């Protein structure tokens, strides 16, 4: 039975956890952080081990689960919305899944020829813990000495970079408990929306492009090849959402699909792929918190703020003017027009991935811009990765300049910029 302490407590609290027990914690909103210290035993947070007697700081609104396999004692100081223990946790099932994937990696290791390790896709509706399960599986793999690739197709949260982006990252160390996986040198593409719905064709095109790059990495890196990849997906699982799941599963040649919570999706995918793909149905954790639309918006804003200022506000972004004449601004996707108005031989799908020049206006204020890695228009800007992001803080049409917030000082490394529908108001 769960024991709960539901009070915004400021005092220092100690918790003693028995083996196979989880302490679920929600830090209160506001301006006070919570500090967690492992006093004895062993414990982990989403697959990353806690270091004994080290202070870990969690920001207001943080939600985490401290799990122990053998038992432990932890101390928490700071304002908590909720803190309770539970022995009803799917962690043993998640560990069994990891061990099955590890056996696949061992088989791939033994082949002298290049043998692909597990390509795992985690799917399910919103708020079932997909990102957490992906983080667990990746952390466990890295702790075994593997080098898996983390693939993020969830444009709503954008854990590979910023919301509205898709990407992949080769992992060499477990996620930092406070800051997550190190995002040095990720492969990132701009989708530009927080849901796949505005542009299914572009979403599928970028999924396929990332899959191609991942397989190229597998060919060059035998360790990464045997380690495989773990793919996080959006929480849309019906209609177009289901179609993009199937497309991504095919593009990445997935051999394991983990379905969290929803039996209907599990059965649909079993019928779709038959015996070609192992479909695994797992329960969601009881600690998963349902997020409101407002909460999701706040998380996206915090993600963008962290990109420019750092998780602990330890980065100092640069603000400077950029002349309109020094850059070329585009957006991906032209407005839909009646089929009768399209040029001969063209379909609506081509409009969805068309590169459209953008004339700077006051509407650019607060917009997120991606810096394309392309050096000329002869390259396909739509399918070229991006190397960074800017936010437009001001637009001066008389002087033909815009003031941007940038992680790096001037000058800009490239001149081709892609417009996103994501907006960020920098009140720092």
Curated annotation (Swiss-Prot):
GO terms classed as biological process: mRNA 3'-end processing; tRNA splicing, via endonucleolytic cleavage and ligation
Subcellular location: Nucleus
Record GO cellular component, one term: nucleus
Keywords of this entry: ATP-binding, mRNA processing, Nucleotide-binding, Nucleus
Stretches assigned to coiled coil: none
Domain of life (superkingdom): Eukaryota
An annotated Gene Ontology molecular function: ATP binding
InterPro entries in the record: Clp1, Clp1/Grc3, Clp1_C, Clp1_C_sf, Clp1_N, Clp1_N_sf, CLP1_P, P-loop_NTPase
Binding site for ATP: 22, 63, 127-132
Extent of the signal sequence: none
Entries under Gene3D superfamilies matching the protein: Clp1, DNA binding domain, P-loop containing nucleotide triphosphate hydrolases, Pre-mRNA cleavage complex subunit Clp1, C-terminal domain
Family annotation (PANTHER family): CLEAVAGE/POLYADENYLATION FACTOR IA SUBUNIT CLP1P, POLYRIBONUCLEOTIDE 5'-HYDROXYL-KINASE CLP1
Family to which the UniProt record says this protein belongs: Belongs to the Clp1 family. Clp1 subfamily.
Its job: Required for endonucleolytic cleavage during polyadenylation-dependent pre-mRNA 3'-end formation.
HAMAP family: Clp1
UniProt-recorded name of the protein: Protein CLP1 homolog
């Amino acid at each position: 039975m769960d024991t709960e302490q539901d009070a915004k407590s400021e005092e220092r609290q100690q918790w003693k956890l028995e083996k196979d027990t989880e302490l679920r914690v929600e830090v209160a909103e506001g301006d006070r952080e919570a500090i967690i210290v492992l006093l004895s035993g062993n414990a982990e947070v989403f697959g990353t081990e806690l270091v004994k007697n080290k202070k870990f700081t969690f920001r207001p609104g943080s939600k985490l689960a401290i799990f122990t396999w053998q038992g432990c004692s932890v101390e928490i100081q700071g304002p908590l919305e909720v803190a309770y223990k539970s022995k009803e946790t799917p962690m043993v099932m998640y560990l069994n899944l990891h061990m099955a994937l590890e056996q696949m990696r061992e088989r791939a290791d033994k082949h002298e020829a290049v043998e692909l390790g597990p390509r795992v896709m985690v799917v399910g509706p919103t708020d079932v813990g997909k990102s957490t399960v992906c983080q667990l599986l990746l952390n466990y793999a890295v702790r075994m000495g593997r080098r898996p690739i983390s693939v993020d197709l969830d444009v709503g949260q954008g854990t590979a970079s910023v919301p509205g982006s898709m990407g992949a990252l080769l992992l060499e160390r477990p996620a930092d408990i406070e800051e997550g996986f190190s995002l040095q040198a990720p492969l990132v593409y701009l989708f530009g929306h927080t849901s796949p719905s505005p542009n299914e064709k572009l979403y599928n095109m970028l999924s396929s492009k990332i899959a191609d790059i991942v397989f190229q990495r597998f060919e060059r890196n035998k360790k990464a090849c045997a380690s495989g990849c773990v793919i996080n997906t959006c929480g849309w699982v019906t209609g177009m959402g289901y179609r993009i799941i199937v497309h991504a599963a095919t593009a990445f040649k997935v051999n394991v699909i983990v379905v969290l919570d929803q039996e209907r999706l599990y059965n649909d995918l079993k019928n779709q792929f038959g015996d070609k793909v192992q479909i695994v149905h797992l329960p969601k954790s009881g600690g998963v918190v349902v997020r409101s639309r407002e909460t999701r918006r706040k998380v996206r804003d915090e993600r963008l703020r962290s990109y420019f200022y750092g998780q602990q506000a330890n980065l100092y972004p640069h603000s400077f003017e950029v002349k309109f004449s020094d850059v070329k601004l585009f957006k991906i996707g032209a407005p839909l027009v009646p089929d009768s108005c399209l040029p001969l031989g063209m379909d609506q799908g081509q409009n969805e991935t068309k590169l459209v020049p953008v004339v700077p206006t006051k509407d650019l204020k607060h917009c997120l811009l991606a810096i394309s890695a392309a050096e000329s228009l002869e390259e396909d800007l739509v399918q070229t990765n991006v190397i960074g992001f800017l936010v437009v803080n001001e637009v001066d049409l008389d002087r033909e300049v815009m003031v941007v917030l940038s992680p790096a000082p001037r000058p800009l490394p490239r001149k081709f910029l892609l417009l996103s529908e994501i907006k960020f108001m920098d009140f720092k």
